[in-house]
């Protein structure tokens, strides 16, 4: 809830706005934005399972969940948000991604991009995580992200709160192990070892500051008078 509320504050949502969510997942953010802020939301995903559940969660709200590729979209939106999707775009497609987002955003609109980022070593791909958790996932380094985003947008704000991801992942690890007594009839011990390893290695990568968690707020041509960012820690709520 804290993460969703921080996103909404940074987007400076107003009732009646049209919002596009690129990579809407299971529909939680789309529902939150619509219920709390009175905006209409178009959410897109390439997963049939996600689309089905998201539509169920958002039933009765001005939310449209579409099974679509972002490259095929048309229209114009006051706000765009994309959470945890850039990691799956691929570095060769960054220009296409940002160019399409710019074409969909109104001139005075805002685009919030939420992504895990790599440290100083350049684009990061872990072979084990790619095989078992996130196929074809790539983490962008800051310089590549700034260069490509900056071709199409003004970077109004760049928030790094990766240190907060460490306690989040540890909480997931504890919840997973606490629930294992109910889950073990459906999953193997091998799966448990795999997921334990994933959660702990990921927590370590953020604790060591090897990986980062970024939220960028982008505008089309710069906000007149400047953008006033929301600054609070999601882990503190």
Q: For the regions a protein language model found, what residue spans apply to each?
A:
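Conserved SAM-binding loop
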Residues: 54-55
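Substrate-binding/catalytic lobe of Class I Rossmann-like enzymes that use SAM or dcSAM, i.e.
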Residues: 116-225, 234
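Conserved class I S-adenosyl-L-methionine
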Residues: 16-23
């Amino acid at each position: 809830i804290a993460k969703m509320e921080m996103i909404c504050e940074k987007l400076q949502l107003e009732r009646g706005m049209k919002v596009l969510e690129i990579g809407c997942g299971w529909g939680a953010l789309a529902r939150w934005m619509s219920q709390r802020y009175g905006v209409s939301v178009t959410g897109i995903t390439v997963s049939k399972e996600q689309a089905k559940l998201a539509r169920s969660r958002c039933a009765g709200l001005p939310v449209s969940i579409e099974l679509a590729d972002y490259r095929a979209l048309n229209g114009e939106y006051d706000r765009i948000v994309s959470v945890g999707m850039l990691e799956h775009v691929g570095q060769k497609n960054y220009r296409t991604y940002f160019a399409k987002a710019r074409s969909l955003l109104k001139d005075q609109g805002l685009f919030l991009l939420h992504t895990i980022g790599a440290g100083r070593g350049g684009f990061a791909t872990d072979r084990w995580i790619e095989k078992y958790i996130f196929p074809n996932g790539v983490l962008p380094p800051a310089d590549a992200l700034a260069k490509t985003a900056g071709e199409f947008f003004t970077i109004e704000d760049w928030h790094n709160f990766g240190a907060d991801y460490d306690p989040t992942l540890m909480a997931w690890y504890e919840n997973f192990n606490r629930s294992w007594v109910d889950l073990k009839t459906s999953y193997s011990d091998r799966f448990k070892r795999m997921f334990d390893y994933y959660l702990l290695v990921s927590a370590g990568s953020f604790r060591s500051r090897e990986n980062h968690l970024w939220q960028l707020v982008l505008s089309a041509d710069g906000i007149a008078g400047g953008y006033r960012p929301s600054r609070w820690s999601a882990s503190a709520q």
